[in-house]
């Protein structure tokens, strides 16, 4: 057993099993405390909520509570290992919600026979929570599940594997294009992978200005094109009317490569076929589509991002999902819509262009960081993230009409 594996197991097992717990927010030391907390005092908020359902936000924790829900069919890079095996990941997500955005979470692992069973189960318990984070659900079922739950629930439903990845990728890519002197409207983009993250990334990039006809998506059978007869409805959206069939054909002259597929699928020779000043986001974890050392040896005009923390430009969903929910819940949004996602993209993009505080340098164990090829995305430990992203998302929710209440006074106003 490797040292790191044992350390990871010990971290989860000691001093008590798991990573999260429930803490009390009210005193419970006296008989009177208990009378207020439960019977008979609890009857008063019950009556208030029955009379005015919105009072549930006044008298319970609903407004700060997120459900983290999975069926374990696509756990990290490990695959379909079932609901119970996903529990450490869901607890980890809850830890990140609390650590970075002060949000409480409950992890829920669902065993089900059909996709509709899963949808019905989640929809039945949705009103308990202020928002729902879907996690580690395989494609294409994840698309159907999220769509159905958004339609049935009046709280935010967000599949982070799709949209969190898309938001961080889009923010980093917009900055990389700016540094390389290229425009997203003209960029030729190759996407290796056609699952949940890949499709969401490309759809969001289109909303940022990318042209659908400039995108070449590949799955395990090669280029997704209009003459293929084996495509599901989601891949069909990216079927390109082209005679190109291989990675080598589509990557020749390409400006951008986005990998959300598997390890070692992009070679140094492939990279050399790309246009001048290429951009590579090799996001497969733990091993990227091309190792950064190999990529940087092949091209010295490259901007490279990966999902790894030990190299520059880590594409990490923790840069957005805690803060998107923070902003959405704080205005009681009924959904997380495209305007809110784009607001998060631009908040992240803009933050990376600002001077970096000393505390971030210390946490990242570096002496300096400045906007450039090795710093296109903020660092996860940047304390400004919550305020910037949550505020942008909350404002977008209000302006797009999905917020139930106005922006709180001085909401994350710096210096306010």
Residue ranges and their predicted role:
Residues 236-303, 308-310:
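Rossmann-like adenosine-cofactor binding region
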Residues 76, 81-101, 159, 163, ...:
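Glycine-rich phosphate/diphosphate-binding loop of Rossmann-like nucleotide-binding domains
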Residues 107, 133-136, 157-160, 217, ...:
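General beta-strand structural signal in soluble alpha/beta enzymes
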Residues 27, 31, 38, 42, ...:
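Generic structural signal for well-ordered, non-membrane alpha-helical segments
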């Amino acid at each position: 057993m490797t040292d790191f594996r044992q350390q990871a197991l010990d971290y989860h097992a000691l001093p008590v099993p798991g990573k999260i717990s429930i803490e009390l927010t009210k005193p419970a030391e006296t008989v009177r405390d208990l009378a207020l907390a439960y019977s008979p005092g609890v009857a008063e908020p019950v009556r208030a909520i029955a009379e005015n359902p919105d009072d549930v936000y006044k008298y319970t924790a609903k407004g700060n509570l997120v459900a983290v829900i999975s069926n374990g069919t696509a756990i990290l890079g490990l695959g379909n290992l079932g609901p119970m095996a996903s529990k450490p990941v869901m607890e980890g997500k809850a830890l990140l919600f609390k650590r970075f955005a002060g949000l409480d979470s409950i992890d829920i692992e669902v065993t089900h026979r059909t996709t509709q069973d899963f949808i019905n189960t989640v929809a039945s318990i949705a009103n308990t929570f202020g928002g729902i984070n879907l996690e580690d659900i395989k494609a294409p079922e994840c698309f159907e599940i999220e769509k159905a739950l958004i339609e049935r629930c009046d709280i935010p439903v967000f599949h982070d594997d799709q949209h969190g990845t898309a938001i961080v990728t889009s923010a980093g890519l917009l900055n990389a294009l700016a540094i390389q002197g290229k425009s997203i409207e003209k960029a030729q983009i190759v996407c290796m992978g056609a699952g949940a993250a890949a499709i969401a990334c490309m759809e969001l990039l289109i909303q940022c200005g990318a042209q659908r006809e400039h995108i070449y998506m590949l799955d395990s059978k090669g280029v997704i094109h209009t003459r293929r007869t084996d495509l599901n409805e989601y891949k069909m959206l990216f079927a390109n009317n082209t005679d190109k069939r291989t990675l080598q054909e589509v990557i020749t002259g390409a400006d951008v490569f986005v990998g959300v597929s598997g390890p070692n699928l992009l070679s140094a020779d492939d990279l050399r076929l790309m246009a001048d000043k290429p951009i590579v986001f090799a996001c497969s974890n733990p091993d990227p589509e091309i190792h950064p050392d190999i990529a940087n040896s092949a091209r010295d005009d490259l901007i490279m991002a990966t999902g790894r923390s030990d190299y520059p430009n880590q594409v990490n969903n923790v840069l957005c999902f805690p803060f998107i929910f923070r902003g959405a819940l704080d205005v009681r949004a009924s959904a997380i819509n495209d305007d809110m996602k784009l607001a998060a993209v631009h908040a992240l993009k803009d933050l990376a262009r600002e001077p970096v505080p000393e505390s971030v340098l210390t946490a990242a164990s570096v002496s300096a960081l400045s906007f450039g090829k090795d710093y296109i995305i903020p660092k996860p430990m940047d304390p400004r993230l919550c305020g910037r992203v949550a505020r942008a998302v909350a404002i977008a929710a209000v302006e797009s009409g999905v917020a139930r209440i106005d922006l709180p006074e001085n909401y994350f106003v710096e210096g306010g």
